[in-house]
C-alpha cells in the first residue's frame, strides 16, 4: 500500500491532555482548561433546552441541507439562504475549500504563524503552501501576501482575528487588499472569533460579499456561542461560489443536535453580549499583568491572549499543568517563549495569574 508521498510530512493533530487525565496524573481535585479557546461560560440556556427536545430524534438522520438553521442564519446575517454552506465546524469548510480548489499544480498563501489547518489541508491536496511571516505586531502582512500571488495561486487565507496572536486586519487594509488581488483568486477570511471583536476599525465583512465575488467568510458556533462539542461552522459567499463547492461537502455533515442548538443560540444574543463584556474585562486582567511584569502581550480581539514570557514555553506549560491549569504552549505555535491562554472567568484568571507571578 502506498499513501500520498506528501502526506508523510504531516503529523496527526495532537489534542491536549483531557482534564480527567491531568487530575489522575498529578493527583489534583481541580483542573481548569484554558487551552482551546472555549467559552468559560458555556452556552445559552436556550441551546440546552433545544438539545433536550432534539435528543428524542437521535434515530433520524439530520437535515442534510440544514434548512431551518439556514433560514434563521440568513435572516441574522441579512444574506440569501443560498449564500451559506455548513460544516462540521469551520474546520470542515476549510477542508471543503481545499478539496475544491487545490491540487499539485496549484499554490495557496497563508500567514505564518496562523491557524494550521489551512496548510494541513492544502498539503493533503498536494498544493504548494507559501507562508508569509507576520509583521512584528502579529498581524498579516497583506502587501507581502499579495506579492506572493502568481498564476498558480488559487486561495489566500486571512485569519482575522489571527490565531494565535489575536491581532486583526483593519478595514482599510482589507479593502486595499481586495481591490488589488486578482478576481480569479479566492480570498478566505476566517472570522472564528468575530463575535469577540470590539475594534472600531474592524471591517463589516458580510456586506463586502456583494462587491467581491471571490471573497468567502468563515465563522463558527464553537467559540463565543459555546457549542464546540457540537461542531457547527459555516461559510458565507457568492451564491455561485457556494453552488460550485457544495459537491465537495459530505452529506449529513452537521448533526440534528448541532443544528437545533445553533438556532436557539442565535436567538439569545443577550448571552453573547454578556460573554463579550466579561471577556473584555478578562483581557484587561492579562494586559495589567503583562505591564506589571514587563512582558509583551499582543493586543487581542479574541478570547485568548499570547504573552511572551521570555523563557521556554514548554517549561511554563508544564509548571502550570502540575498546578492544574492547562494552557497552550507557544512552542508548537511558532512562539517558543510564549503561552496562549484562553480568557477564563474572573476567578480563573486571578488564580492562574497568581501562579504565573510566583513562577516568574
Swiss-Prot record:
Q: Gene3D superfamilies attached here?
A: Aspartate Aminotransferase, domain 1 (3.90.1150.10), Type I PLP-dependent aspartate aminotransferase-like (Major domain) (3.40.640.10)
One GO term in the molecular function aspect is:
histidinol-phosphate transaminase activity
EC assignment: the record states 2.6.1.9
CDD domains, per this entry? AAT_like
Q: Give the PROSITE patterns listed for this entry.
A: AA_TRANSFER_CLASS_2
Give, as in the UniProt entry, the pathway in which the protein acts.
Amino-acid biosynthesis; L-histidine biosynthesis; L-histidine from 5-phospho-alpha-D-ribose 1-diphosphate: step 7/9
Kindly state which reaction or reactions the protein catalyses. Answer: L-histidinol phosphate + 2-oxoglutarate = 3-(imidazol-4-yl)-2-oxopropyl phosphate + L-glutamate
Q: Which branch of life, at top level?
A: Bacteria
Q: Which NCBIfam families match?
A: hisC (TIGR01141)
Q: Which family does it belong to?
A: Belongs to the class-II pyridoxal-phosphate-dependent aminotransferase family. Histidinol-phosphate aminotransferase subfamily.
Question: What is the name attached to this protein's record?
Answer: Histidinol-phosphate aminotransferase
Q: Which organism was this protein described from?
A: Bacillus subtilis subsp. natto
The organism's lineage?
A: Bacteria, Bacillati, Bacillota, Bacilli, Bacillales
